[in-house]
Design a protein with these regions (language model features):
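Active-site nucleotide/adenylate-binding loops and adjacent lid/helix of ATP-dependent enzymes
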Residues: 116-170
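Short histidine/acidic/glycine/proline-rich micro-motifs that form metal-
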Residues: 62, 88-89, 113-117, 142
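Residue-level detector of family-conserved "landmark" positions at structurally sensitive sites
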Residues: 85, 111, 137-139
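Short alpha-helical interface patches
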Residues: 100-103, 113-120
Length: 170
């Protein structure tokens, strides 16, 4: 039996990863962690009603100094074989950890740190994808400069306003 850690388990991608692993390898032990104590509340059952995650831990924020010591203890205590790292903010920090330590806390599956740097800020991502078919018309607004006239003329109402980072940026 393998033990797999999935970070950011409250997010859609980590839950999807967990569902596939549970479906293909029901004997694997899945450990989830997230900074949000409510992350385990939604969509955490398999199709046949089993728990998606075997153990759940509330993690320190990945940009805090206590994150990696906490994570290293978890990997050791739970005998984690592999980790799947999400979301982009954690990928960036794990990438930095690797640059300093020349290793990850355990064998790891994750995206590219440099790409994740741009993808975690939805405004930067919109700038990179501007003019392609991969993103709808986009205008950067702020609370200080809401640009209502530009939104009305260029995008039109109704429209969707998103946060550039975090769960509001999903």
């Amino acid at each position: 039996m393998k033990t797999i850690l999935i970070t950011g388990i409250g997010g859609l991608t980590p839950r999807s990863i967990a569902k596939i692993i549970k479906e293909k390898h029901p004997d694997y032990k899945l450990i989830g962690c997230d900074v949000d104590k409510k992350a385990m509340g939604f969509f955490m059952k398999t199709k046949d009603g089993r728990q998606l995650i075997d153990e759940y831990f509330i993690a320190p924020r990945c940009d805090r100094p206590e994150y990696f010591p906490w994570l290293e203890r978890l990997v050791t205590e739970k005998k984690v074989d592999y980790s799947f790292v999400e979301p982009e903010s954690e990928i960036v920090e794990w990438g930095r950890y690797y640059e300093v330590n020349r290793k990850y806390p355990c064998p790891t599956f994750m995206g590219c740190r440099l790409l994740s740097e741009s993808l975690r800020d939805k405004a930067i991502m919109a700038e990179l994808l501007e003019g392609t078919e991969f993103i709808p018309k986009t205008i950067k607004v702020t609370q200080k400069n809401p640009r209502f006239e530009d939104v009305e003329k260029k995008i039109e109402f109704p429209c969707w306003i998103r946060a550039t980072e975090g769960t509001g940026g999903l």
